[in-house]
């Protein structure tokens, strides 16, 4: 049961958030009338069907290719599936994606892992963007049409990163006919949300189009005290400058005000589970974590004819956040029940990022066969700065984790904020790729990238100039439905550790080998795949054995190596016109092949060896197929985390979700989602004995009314 007591500031924020909801409530209510009026004048009513449960086409490789034509594992989660499962944030989308492990509150943000490595490559409409940073707010999915996830290394188009995955968020774009989508939802723990999505032509010819999206949310959590109020606005316009040229530009803004939960729960000092209630909140009631994120963007695309196109895209981001918290820190002694004390701090984070990507692509005829070429380049410039303030008076309060009152500690002041200085990161690269038709059933994919990378931080500078990243793949069509493929992909990651000569180590290199089979069944409506993969990451930093550390001063050599390997199976799309399915299974093991401390040990023990995820939905034949039922299963094996001399463990678990929806008429649909039906108690992530161990969500429900015109 959630505690109703809140701080005055928290009550004020919730009242303000509810006030902000009224404009969108009115928009949802008024849109049917506006739609009917416009339909009577010029346009018929249009039903927005979304982008499917698993669209067949992915754009993260610049070329609009089917999943079958990409020689790596790809998952596409479309708008229809996000609506069915009520996936309203990127965290929720990733929790249901094949092979992804989600770990909340890792360095103040949510971390995603694929194949044992942290995902650090993110794109928006194919342009590399800043995410996974303390200043960048969590992503609201109201803006996006679909999410594309390419697993493995992707250094060819993205540059520096880990051999984990690339996540491409594809924005909603204006349509040539009027369309409206409005949603009102209410759920467990006082979660309320309103969305409105309106777009269409802005002149008679349709050569000027626009689309606006707004969303407000006011929510609590399954743990006490914490809440969050968020507001989002997205606007985009498109202009046909000519029959082959389109200019688009837009703005995206998100504001979040939250009472956060930094502490999570601790463990016993021997690593055992204390068994605290899932509603436990071990922070101070005055905690807050706030974000303001603004992104402006523009694209210019031109078709030259005969299949050749050129596109240039630019993004500019400003992201600011501030955090003030106090939370329980310290492992608990089994005998005394003591060990935690209140610790806290105050921080401000400022970020800017400018990014640009430009490319040309098109077909060529060589030796009597048609091939495709892609030539381009991209660049990013990021600045970031962290300010730290000391709480005054400093907190050193014992915490009884079995009977803690979050309101018992008065809010302290904050001393002057200080910063060591600004960190600047620049990366540029040029890339080329060709898809060469060697024979009717055989396509060879070859590519390469040259990257220039440099970073200046307080007291340190680093430059990589240049770094070559190769790529290769082979696709063999067995028949019209099935293909075999193999690929070789590489990526590099700079390191900041210094050798005894005072020079930074060479970059870590990640190499991804993959082979598999893909099928596009039922005329491409159902995609299936089976893949095996082998990843090696070399040149990892190791302490120099010939130069022992003196205090905190250590020297390093590039001697570390890890390996990750496994296989994946996935099926997604339409089994029949009324039955959709999205299922994925991943088996993955990882190991330190060469490490001065952990040699021979598992590399990423916190990622399960086995992950199975399923979502399916079926429109029943009765009642003109107005009633549909759906369900999902998430199964995974156990995982562990090493914390000093002890190991924390979470056993395997299974979660079951259910959904029922009823189409009231051709415009209105009501749905009910029930998640974690059997109320399974589990830890979503384990960090250590002292704090930041996170329960997964208990059983919860969400009721949604959706209007589409």
Feature-to-residue mapping (PLM):
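Short acidic/polar hinge/loop motifs at secondary-structure boundaries
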Residues: 102, 111, 127-151, 169-171
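Outer-membrane beta-barrel translocator/receptor signature
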Residues: 142-145, 156-235, 241-245, 294, ...
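Acidic/polar loop-and-plug regions of large Gram-negative outer-membrane beta-barrel proteins
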Residues: 217-221, 234-303, 316-351, 395-423, ...
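Surface-exposed extracellular loop regions of Gram-negative outer-membrane beta-barrel proteins
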Residues: 257-268, 383-385, 474-519, 524-557, ...
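C-terminal beta-signal and adjacent terminal beta-strands/loops
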Residues: 634-642, 661-709
């Amino acid at each position: 049961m959630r505690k109703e007591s809140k701080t005055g500031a928290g009550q004020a924020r919730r009242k303000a958030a509810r006030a902000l909801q009224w404009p969108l409530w009115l928009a949802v209510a008024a849109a049917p009338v506006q739609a009917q009026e416009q339909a009577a004048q010029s346009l018929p009513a249009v039903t927005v069907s979304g982008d499917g449960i698993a669209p067949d086409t992915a754009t993260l490789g610049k070329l609009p290719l089917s999943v079958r034509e990409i020689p790596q594992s790809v998952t596409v989660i479309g708008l229809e599936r996000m609506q069915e499962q009520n996936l309203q944030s990127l965290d929720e989308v990733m929790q249901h994606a094949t092979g992804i492990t989600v770990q909340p509150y890792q360095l103040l943000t949510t971390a995603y892992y694929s194949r044992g490595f942290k995902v650090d490559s993110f794109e928006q409409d194919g342009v590399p963007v800043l995410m996974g940073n303390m200043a960048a707010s969590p992503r609201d999915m109201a803006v996006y049409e679909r999410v594309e996830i390419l697993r493995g290394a992707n250094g060819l188009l993205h540059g520096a990163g880990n051999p984990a995955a690339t996540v491409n968020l594809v924005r909603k774009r204006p349509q040539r006919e009027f369309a409206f989508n409005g949603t009102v939802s209410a759920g467990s723990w006082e979660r309320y949300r309103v969305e409105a999505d309106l777009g269409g032509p802005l002149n008679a010819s349709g050569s000027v189009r626009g689309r606006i999206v707004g969303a407000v949310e006011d929510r609590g959590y399954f743990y006490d005290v914490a809440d969050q109020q968020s507001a989002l606005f997205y606007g985009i316009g498109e202009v046909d400058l000519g029959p082959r040229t389109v200019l688009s530009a837009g703005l995206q803004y998100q504001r979040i005000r939250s009472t956060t939960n930094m502490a999570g729960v601790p463990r016993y000092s021997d690593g055992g589970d204390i068994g605290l209630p899932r509603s436990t909140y071990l922070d101070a009631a005055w905690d807050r974590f706030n974000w303001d994120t603004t992104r402006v963007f523009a694209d210019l695309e031109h078709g030259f004819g005969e299949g050749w196109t050129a596109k240039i895209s630019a993004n500019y981001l400003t992201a600011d956040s501030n955090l003030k918290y106090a939370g329980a820190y310290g492992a608990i002694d089994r005998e005394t029940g003591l060990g935690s004390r209140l610790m806290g701090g105050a921080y401000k984070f400022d970020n800017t990022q400018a990014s640009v990507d430009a490319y040309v692509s098109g077909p060529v005829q060589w030796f009597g066969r048609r091939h495709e070429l892609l030539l381009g380049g991209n660049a990013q410039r990021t600045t970031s700065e962290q300010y730290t303030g000391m709480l005054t008076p400093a907190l050193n309060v014992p915490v009884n984790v079995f009977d803690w009152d979050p309101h018992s500690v008065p809010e302290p002041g904050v001393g002057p904020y200080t910063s060591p200085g600004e960190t600047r990161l620049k990366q540029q690269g040029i890339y080329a790729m060709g898809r060469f038709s060697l024979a009717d059933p055989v396509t060879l994919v070859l590519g390469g990238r040259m990257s220039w990378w440099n970073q200046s931080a307080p007291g340190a500078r680093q430059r990589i100039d240049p770094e070559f990243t190769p790529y290769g793949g082979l696709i063999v069509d067995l028949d019209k439905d099935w293909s075999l493929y193999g690929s070789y992909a590489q990526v590099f990651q700079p390191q900041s550790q210094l050798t005894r000569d005072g020079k930074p180590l060479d970059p870590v290199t990640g190499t991804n080998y993959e082979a598999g089979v893909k099928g596009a069944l039922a005329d491409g409506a159902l995609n299936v795949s089976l893949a095996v993969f082998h990843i090696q990451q070399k040149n990892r930093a190791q302490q120099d054995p010939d130069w022992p550390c003196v205090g905190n001063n250590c020297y390093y050599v590039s001697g570390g190596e890890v390996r990750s390997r496994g296989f994946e199976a996935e099926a997604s799309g339409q089994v029949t016109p009324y039955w959709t399915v999205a299922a994925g299974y991943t088996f993955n093991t990882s190991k330190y092949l060469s490490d001065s401390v952990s040699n021979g040990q598992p590399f990423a023990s916190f990622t399960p060896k086995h992950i199975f995820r399923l979502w399916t939905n079926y429109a029943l034949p009765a009642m003109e197929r107005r009633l549909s039922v759906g369900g999902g299963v998430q199964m995974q094996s156990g995982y562990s985390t090493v914390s000093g001399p002890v190991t924390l463990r979470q056993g395997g678990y299974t979660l079951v979700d259910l959904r029922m929806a009823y189409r009231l008429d051709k415009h209105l649909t009501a749905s009910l989602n029930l998640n974690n039906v059997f109320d399974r108690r589990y830890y979503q992530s384990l960090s250590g004995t002292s704090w930041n161990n996170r329960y997964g969500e208990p059983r919860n429900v969400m009721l949604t009314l959706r209007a589409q015109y």
